């Protein structure tokens, strides 16, 4: 059974007309979760993508990024919602469908020039990933690649990120569905 088949689709959530891709069904399935981590690990081992640190977006990026950090022997840095990190932070505001949000990272989380794998569960508009990349770059890091379980290419995030020069790796996608 493939990764895609383990992801539940919830129609009309969080609002009418949206097909919500719920990865919690994938994460609770021990074989499915192992497939995710094994396939991501294999990609980075086989393709020799050079990076020093894994940065995960709150909240599901923590789950994937933490497991991937363990399997690949890399450190892990969380990007969090405002007010969740003690100490000095940098922040980045980004656009939501109706308004804005903000994410934060410790100012000393990365050494200057660190190459980073940015990890999140799903790529839709690209706003969260762009905010994460901006934080990494603000503290002197470089995005080596971005990894996602799911890509929703029709929403435009993939195109936006690639136009900015970011390399992406996605395990599966839901196109026009």
Swiss-Prot record:
For this protein, what reaction is catalysed?
AMP + diphosphate = 5-phospho-alpha-D-ribose 1-diphosphate + adenine
Alphabetical list of InterPro entries matching this protein: Ade_phspho_trans, PRibTrfase_dom, PRTase-like, UPRTase/APRTase
Q: Name one GO cellular component term.
A: cytoplasm
Mainly localized where?
Answer: cytoplasm
- Give the GO terms filed under biological process for this record: adenine salvage; AMP salvage; purine ribonucleoside salvage
Keywords linked to the UniProt accession: Cytoplasm, Glycosyltransferase, Purine salvage, Transferase
- Give the molecular function GO annotations: adenine binding; adenine phosphoribosyltransferase activity; AMP binding
Pathway(s) of this molecule: Purine metabolism; AMP biosynthesis via salvage pathway; AMP from adenine: step 1/1
Q: Provide the protein's localization.
A: Cytoplasm
- The keyword Membrane appears for this protein: no
Q: What EC number(s) is this enzyme filed under?
A: 2.4.2.7
What HAMAP family does the record point to? Aden_phosphoribosyltr (MF_00004)
Its biological purpose is as follows: Catalyzes a salvage reaction resulting in the formation of AMP, that is energically less costly than de novo synthesis.
What family does this chain come from, according to its entry?
A: Belongs to the purine/pyrimidine phosphoribosyltransferase family.
NCBIfam families the UniProt entry points to: apt, PRK02304.1-3, PRK02304.1-5
User: Could you give the subunit structure recorded for this chain?
Assistant: Homodimer.
Name used for this protein in its record: Adenine phosphoribosyltransferase
Q: What is the lineage of its organism?
A: Bacteria, Pseudomonadati, Chlorobiota, Chlorobiia, Chlorobiales
């Amino acid at each position: 059974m493939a990764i895609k088949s383990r992801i539940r689709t919830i129609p009309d959530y969080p609002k009418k007309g949206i097909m919500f891709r719920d990865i919690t069904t994938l994460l609770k399935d021990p074989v499915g979760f192992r497939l995710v981590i094994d396939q991501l690990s294999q990609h980075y081992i086989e393709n020799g993508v050079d990076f020093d640190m894994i940065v995960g977006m709150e909240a599901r990026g923590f789950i994937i990024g933490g497991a991937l950090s363990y399997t690949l022997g890399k450190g892990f840095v969380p990007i969090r919602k405002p007010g969740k990190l003690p100490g000095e932070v940098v922040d980045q505001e980004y656009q939501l469908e109706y308004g804005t949000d903000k994410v934060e990272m410790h100012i000393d989380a990365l050494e200057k020039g660190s190459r980073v794998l940015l990890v999140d569960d799903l790529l839709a508009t690209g706003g969260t990933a762009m905010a994460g990349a901006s934080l990494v770059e603000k503290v002197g890091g470089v995005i080596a690649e971005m990894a996602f379980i799911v890509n929703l290419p029709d929403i435009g995030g993939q195109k936006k990120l690639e136009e900015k020069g970011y390399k992406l790796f996605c395990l599966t996608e839901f196109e026009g569905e």
